[in-house]
Amino acid sequence: MISDEIFEQTGISSFLTDCATSQLVDSLNWRIQNGIDKILAKPIIPADLYRAVRDSQLVGMSGYSKEGLPIIAVGVGLSTYDKASIHYYIQSHIQMNEYRDRVILPSATKQYGRHISTCVKILDMTGLKLSALNQIKLLTAISTIDDLNYPEKTDTYYIVNVPYIFSACWKVVRPLLQERTRKKVQVLAGSGRDELLKIMDYSSLPHFCKREGSGSSRHSRNGTNDDCFSLDHAFHQQLYSYVKHQAELMEPTTPIKQGSFHVDFPEPNPADAKIAETLQSEFQRLGIQNGLSNSPDNVNISID
């Protein structure tokens, strides 16, 4: 018998009419076979390694919208994913998904007095360059994991600090997106600050939206770290403490083991694979068109 809790945590109850039974079964099997229910008791250690992951996989939570939806910030352009193995980045991503579903969303539901099951994502494109091609395999794996196992968790995607290279790629990628996804995406001018303040208070704005100009600023205010990507930010401190505490509860007399938590990578969704292929072609075309090196490792695109 499948419990209501599993349906709630996986977000499946809201889209059963659109989801094949086989996908539901596959998702539950994926959780069982990979021990996903225990992933929040598997901290990435030592702390220096986790800090390196946080410094190269820029994701965080900056606050809540006026309606109580968690604000998830993603530093798409400046994430390098080059400080650890792919397994640590996958592990960290799934841990944030699970922490959102098991802790953040239930807490928001209680705090705001209504059921909250989705979040708002703000994607910062500052620093986007051709070297992003190197990360397509990892990003496609993460996207596929989310599509198959954490569906319909994002209410709206806001894209900010957009350089020319993104604008050009967006024109060719947008038609490939499913209509329901396309409707969720809003590309804002500059840092998007004015538009975002319509749905959230200033204190909930990600740090990269608080500057008058574009760009990801990292600064402290009133003695607190304002950079929601940093391990020193309150959100990541709470998440990391939670995971370490769960590990101690599970095996109180055993030292926490080092090593990544390996998760099977699903086959890429054909639609995601098509988008990745299109992005790669467009990035390469832009590089040639602008007289840039074809090697993605040493090419920077200015945001002028």
PLM regions and their residue ranges:
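Basic, amphipathic alpha-helical/coil surface patches used to engage anionic, phosphate-bearing ligands
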Residues: 1-304
